């Protein structure tokens, strides 16, 4: 929707976009290698030449197969997941530290069955009842036969950042889009 709104301004209607998706690490590597002008991603430590600007948040939820007995619930205490198998983000994912911290702060050592990089892979494995997962509350969830459970404790949100390389020249179109993103951010 962001690009569509950007194109509504007639001054921006001729600007073309190429979109790529991947893990935070891969996207930031591509940004540093000048494959991308900007990246929307999670924050990643030790990227000193990258400028991270928070632009929005996403609530974290637990997703379970509709075949899982937990699907009868609407919300869940993380302690109730002690005996579940987890489909988990890989160490390359920008979400991994946030989810690790969520479990660590609740003294839970998740029983990780699979580690994957993409949201769609996680949702697909949960859909076939291989395990449960903690994921951002994204529209893609609705394309699977899953039940979303609100997390009772603690409320954690993923912050999405716009990442650019510090002190790198940005063409006017990129500069204009970056300003548009910042002006339309809804960080809370």
Task: Please tell me what each predicted stretch does.
Residues 1, 84-106, 170-178, 188:
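Secondary-structure junction motif
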Residues 1-48, 115-116:
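Central regulatory/effector-binding core of bacterial HTH transcription factors
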Residues 23, 77, 117-118, 136:
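Short loop/turn segments at beta->alpha junctions
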Residues 31-40, 60, 108, 126-133:
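Alpha-to-beta junction loops
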Residues 42-50, 105, 119-147:
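A ligand-binding cleft/hinge motif common to bilobed small-molecule-binding domains
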Residues 47-86, 172:
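Flexible hinge/capping segments at coil-to-helix
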Residues 51-61, 137, 144-159:
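Short beta-strand->loop
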Residues 148-188:
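A late-sequence structural motif
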């Amino acid at each position: 929707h962001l690009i569509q709104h950007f194109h509504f301004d007639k001054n921006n209607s001729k600007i073309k976009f190429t979109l790529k998706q991947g893990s935070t690490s891969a996207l930031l590597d591509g940004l540093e290698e000048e494959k991308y002008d900007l990246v929307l991603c999670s924050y990643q430590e030790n990227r000193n030449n990258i400028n991270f600007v928070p632009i929005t948040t996403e609530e974290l939820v637990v997703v379970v197969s509709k075949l899982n007995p937990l699907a009868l619930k609407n919300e869940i205490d993380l302690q109730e997941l002690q005996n579940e198998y987890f489909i988990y983000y890989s160490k390359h994912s920008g979400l991994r530290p946030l989810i690790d911290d969520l479990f660590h702060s609740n003294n839970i050592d998740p029983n990780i069955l699979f580690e994957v990089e993409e949201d769609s892979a996680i949702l697909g494995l949960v859909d076939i009842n291989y395990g449960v997962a903690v994921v951002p509350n994204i529209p893609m969830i609705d394309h699977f036969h899953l039940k979303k459970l609100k997390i009772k404790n603690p409320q954690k949100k993923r912050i999405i950042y716009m990442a650019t390389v510090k002190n790198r020249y940005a063409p006017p179109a990129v500069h204009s889009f970056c300003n548009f993103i910042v002006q339309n951010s809804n960080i809370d």
